[in-house]
Amino acid sequence: MRGAFLAAAAAVAGTAMADVAHMRRHGHDSFHHNRAYQPEVPAEGDENCECTTKVITITGPPTLVPINTPAPEPSSSSSSEVPSVPSSESSVVTSEAVTTLHSTSTATVTVVTTPGVDATGAQTPTGGVPGTPEASSPAGTPEASTPAVPATSESPLPTPGVTSFSSTGIYTIPATTVTVRDTTTVCGATTTELPSGTHTFGGVTTVVSTATTVTCPVATVEPSGSTVTSKIYTTTYVCPSAGTYTIAPTTTYVPTSTVVVYPTPATITPGTYTQDEQTVTVTRTDFTYVCPFTGNDQPTSAPVASTSAVPVTTTAAPSTTSAVASSSASASSTATAVPTGVSGQQMGMTYSPYTNEGGCQSKDQVLKDVALIKQKGFTHVRVYSTDCNGLEYIGEAARENGLKMIIGVFISSTGISGAQEQVTAITKWAQWDLVTLVVVGNEAIQNGYTDASSLAGFISSCKSSFQASGYSGQVTTTEPINVWQQSGSALCGAVDILGANLHPFFNADVTPDQAGSFVRAQIKDLEAVCNKDVINLETGWPSAGNANGKAVPGTAQQAAAIKALVEEVGSQSVFFSYSNDLWKDAGEFDVERYWGCIDQFK
């Protein structure tokens, strides 16, 4: 939990070096049960619209790629000429390069490329999820062929076309017209650019003038291997009083500026929809463009009350009363307004599902605790291991409350071999749409449970296992600053983002009101270790115990320290911890049991 301050003292006058001998940690390993994994049983009757990413390989020189809509089925008709439905899922034209095109659609799409078309500055775009083009050796003179694709029973619908451009240039997206005869709800698509930090976007807002129950469709993403499926669920949501509510938004953390694509529910009514030809000038790589349909009947979102898509917001400035409904797989829940917290900037809270005696919390208690974390203004909950059905219970609560999870593989005194069971449990659980980060080890090097090179190898092994089960997010470990400074050369290549536990209390020259500036200085020092972004995975201040020089524990002191931490580094920090851990040993300065701080957030 605590980090030695071995870098040059910055931002805190008179800061002394922390005593590395005072690094005996919180004793997370003193109670870790490994319970049998219990898979979730999906609820019957869930409505869903599956919009599956299809991968189509094209061979040809750099050119403009027209994407045509397939011929309609009897329930709809198209006024534009469309290619015949072939019998294979890839369209191949032999040429001098191979590029992969990802296209998200509700119908089979045939992609035709004309060799020799000159497009100034244009490169072949990839549709759907951003992908990396693959190079190949020259294949000789181009010769067109049209492989067959299995016929599909789905009718083309005017869902927005999502295209990701991996290179700069000028691109043309051809016009398409579709006539729809039947009303249906589908997965639309929207893009937004997120700067570095934690953001909330998507979902559906509803404004009610009195207590009421809202039933509406919400869209979500469920990854499985290399396929990402957008699904629509019907949600029943209880608005307890008049106000503005957000139903099923998405909250995520991005280390750098990123363009994200997320699904939105859209009701397609009978009518003619036109997607005009679009010329797109791409000035940056990994650029994503959504080409919408327009027409006599525009797709609309959310059917009950006054609803609309939710714009992107950051946790620094929440402007609406936000509440999240559970999917139709669970009973409807009663929502409460989400307060702004200390200053509305705190990212995450650690949570361990243990009782004061060291037993496992009941499912009802876990659901209640996680709901309170959301109400206090947090966007993430950090879980250390798979103990006490933590993934299942906390995962269910996180989904109901619109929280994201930072999950962990805990390495104890049994070493790396003893942690493998948790890796297996996580890959079976595989609720990856909830997860933004996996932390392999919590101060495992600091505690002497492994060495840096062995940990780096285990991180890489875990990452491969997680990716094979559908995870595409970041993986890291977390250690105090002194370990990173000593072992960064071995660890940096294995992690996607540098994770650190930064506790100002363990520096004897830091007062509570200096906690934020002290940790900010440590983060700046850590950024130079791997030249990667840094996330503070544990930080806080004890509410009881004995003083460590100027670092004095106490309720008032904890409040001052938490306020300083939120103001300085809250958007990139996980606060330790939800409640006091009375099952632990007293530890140095008699503070190890008294880090619970959820009550400091209003």
Swiss-Prot record:
Gene3D superfamilies: Glycosidases. Residues 1-18 form the signal peptide. Pathway: Glycan metabolism; cellulose degradation. Residues 61-94, 116-166 are annotated as: Disordered. The active site is at residues 443, 538. It is found in: Secreted, Cell wall. GO terms for molecular function: glucan endo-1,3-beta-D-glucosidase activity. Residues 74-94 have a biased composition (Low complexity). Keywords: Carbohydrate metabolism, Cell wall, Cellulose degradation, Glycosidase, Hydrolase, Polysaccharide degradation, Secreted, Signal. It is an enzyme of class 3 (hydrolase). GO terms for cellular component: cell surface; extracellular region; fungal-type cell wall. It catalyses: Hydrolysis of terminal, non-reducing beta-D-glucosyl residues with release of beta-D-glucose. InterPro entries: Beta-glucan_modifiers, Glycoside_hydrolase_SF. One of its GO terms (biological process) is cellulose catabolic process. Residues 152-166 have a biased composition (Polar residues). Its EC number is 3.2.1.21. It comes from the Eukaryota. The keyword Signal applies. Belongs to the glycosyl hydrolase 17 family. Beta-glucosidases are one of a number of cellulolytic enzymes involved in the degradation of cellulosic biomass. Catalyzes the last step releasing glucose from the inhibitory cellobiose. This is Probable beta-glucosidase btgE. It comes from Aspergillus oryzae (strain ATCC 42149 / RIB 40) (Yellow koji mold). The lineage of its organism: Eukaryota, Fungi, Dikarya, Ascomycota, Pezizomycotina. The gene is btgE.
